[in-house]
Amino acid sequence: MSTEPAVRSAETGQEVTSLRDLSPQQWKSGIAAWLGWLFDGLDMHLYTLVATPFVAQLLQVGQTDDAVGYYSSVIQAAFLVGWALGGGFFGRIGDRLGRARALVLTILTYALFTGLSFFAQTWWQLMLCRFLAALGIGGEWAVGASLLSETWPRRWRPWIAATLQSAVNIGVLLAMVTGVLVSIVAASSETYAYRSVFLVGILPALLVLWIRKAVPEPEEW
């Protein structure tokens, strides 16, 4: 983990009257959470881009078959359940191991299982991967918010909360760009085009390398 000193509690120390007064450690915590939420937004919408054609491919039926809509919905429902459970699960881990360490685990979780979705051969394998990836996404929302609440001054929390929401929207935009690229590839080869969208979800794992090196634990933890 980071060799940086622990981030001073948000409720102690010199009063912060402007963003320039924030410490480097506080900025790093904010950037880590922001990037985590950005990749959350990206990952959440990757599946929706290819749900119909990919599930049809897994079921070996046409895209207009009623089974495609049914199993696509089941997979999405499993994702939402995982998202709901992830906050409590990784929130508890954050209490035990620390916020920055838990943040690393959440990002690795959704990056790993999003990437593994590429190899799914049945609808239930895809559902399992999406459920496990959602645990990481739900956990990242909770852990990232906790990290900021323990490191950023109270007066700046509404501002950083709004900024985190912008990260999600940018992530969704990146997912749309990915969808355009996939549609271009699919025009020439559909065999792997719809699967390949999930490989983009591996990218957040690179963020872990920086978090482990640069983001310290909150002092109060």
Segments (PLM) and residue ranges:
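Transmembrane-helix signature of 12-pass secondary carriers
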Residues: 1-221
